[in-house]
């Protein structure tokens, strides 16, 4: 097992929210089958407000050893972004932004929508094929 651990290769990769959404739409990105409970709507709204406020997003981790990537860490954030971009959640009772940001993604000014979907994010992509047990161990380490 130590030999396997030493041979793991996580490659840092920069994305935008738009690129992440495109991977999802193309079914090139999926959540891990056993995930933690997804955030409630209030927590999703706070996260989206943080992104709109320019607060940097924590790194994402992906298993990219196969053409269809699996999210190892960040599925809750990806879920919140997807729901917001597809107008499934509406921002309200904002703490950091003015009332003009209340509402759905489609309600934003085009310049604000562009800025949101072009928000840079950093991901670490595992490029080494690993046994399922080791992937589960990595997942637990990232999420504990």
Task: State each model region's role.
Residues 2-13, 17-18, 31-144:
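Basic- and aromatic-enriched surface patches that contact anionic nucleotides/nucleic acids
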Residues 21-29:
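Glycine-rich phosphate-binding segment of PLP-dependent enzymes
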């Amino acid at each position: 097992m130590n030999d396997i651990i030493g041979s793991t290769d996580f490659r840092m990769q920069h994305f935008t929210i738009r690129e992440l959404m495109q991977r999802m739409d193309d079914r090139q990105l999926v959540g891990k089958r056993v995930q933690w409970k997804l955030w409630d709507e209030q927590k999703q709204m706070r996260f989206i407000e943080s992104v709109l406020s320019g607060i940097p997003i924590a790194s994402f981790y992906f298993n990219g050893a196969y053409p269809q990537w699996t999210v190892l860490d960040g599925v809750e954030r990806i879920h919140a972004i997807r729901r917001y971009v597809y107008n499934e959640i509406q921002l309200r009772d904002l703490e950091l932004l003015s009332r003009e940001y209340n509402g759905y993604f489609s309600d934003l000014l085009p310049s604000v929508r562009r800025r949101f979907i072009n928000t840079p994010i950093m991901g670490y992509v595992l490029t080494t094929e690993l046994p399922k047990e080791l992937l589960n161990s990595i997942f637990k380490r990232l999420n504990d």
